């Protein structure tokens, strides 16, 4: 993977997403780009940094509470009129070759979102990126969407690798991306130390920035709690009044659902006696906002996995491991040093970490597998180019993989992976990848 250097005030940070934006800029038949992601994952910063590093000029507009710009989009869409208004609003002389147009919080003005269709059809030479934290929710309210006229990119919290770069440990991160397993194993203790820090801090940009600048876990927790409060405020501000209590119940139930040995989401554990129909809308709202991830069960081990989903069985994870730990009020020392009474939930946190890395760093959509009676569960199933890869997650150096071995004996997959704190290990039927280098699973998916 390649990176471009970007700066967080005085701190060096690198994000994979910037390279994706550069690829989009250079793409033939480029369409306006919509960046999707939860609130506070860094969409605004990324768009501005993209403009700063790749364009001569940036015309940035935020549609949140901007009545003047809202009026510009009333009536028929006129591209020249819109460009003139944005130029006046921002003080930027706009030209197609050298200017990046940024539409932030675009869901606040539905016709601004609709205008992307007209830019695509009538003015494709202009580079436009748009973002909105609650875009999915806005669409459910009937906002007209420019179907087929936009490109998409998803943004997530920082990955573990990006976390290392944010800490200024560039050479350390570069080694992790190499194929030098001996060198990686040599520094295993340090990788595990940093990984446990990442478990607590997570990847929300403001939280990472706070940790990089202060190394103070108390300040980290304060920022995390603030973010969690912001999300609850969004529930009250943007959801239907009748849905808000259910959103809070579903949100609060996530740590409890993950703490179960069988992590299948059970509606009855959200509220006593409740059923799917009571909380399906709340769950979908959180999905649309990017605040949770939903991992579906597959009932067959055949390609394509998506054709064999069990729609009634799924697991739910939070968008960020640091926020998950903040919701449980676990102290930093429990995570960093380990604790004998913190063994059961450690498995849930490790699954959360692995899922987050698979989705954010590699764009992998994982599933999980279990038999009808929920025995012999495989934590994640990954669809590769020509094969299905079972992935078993272990929190420590546990080399046992009973479920994975039974699965392999039954289905004989081309590749099988266990990820744990143990070193690289190739066995006849399985490969162990260290948790801190789970990115390497992409090599198997691409084979």
Regions found by a protein language model. Give the residues of each.
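Pre-Walker A adenine-sensing motif
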Residues: 14-28
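Structural recognition of the conserved hydrophobic beta-strand(s) that form the central parallel beta-sheet
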Residues: 102, 127-133, 154
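Conserved catalytic cores of phosphodiester-cleaving nucleases, focusing on short active-site segments
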Residues: 358, 378-397, 416
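Short glycine-rich substrate-engagement loop in P-loop NTPases that contacts/grips substrate
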Residues: 65-97
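Interdomain motor-coupling "hinge/lid" segment immediately C-terminal to the ATP-binding subdomain
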Residues: 2, 6, 139-260
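Accessory nucleic acid-recognition modules appended to NTPase machines
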Residues: 209-377, 382-383
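Hydrophobic positions on the alpha1 helix immediately C-terminal to the Walker A/P-loop
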Residues: 46, 50
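Conserved lysine of the Walker
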Residues: 43
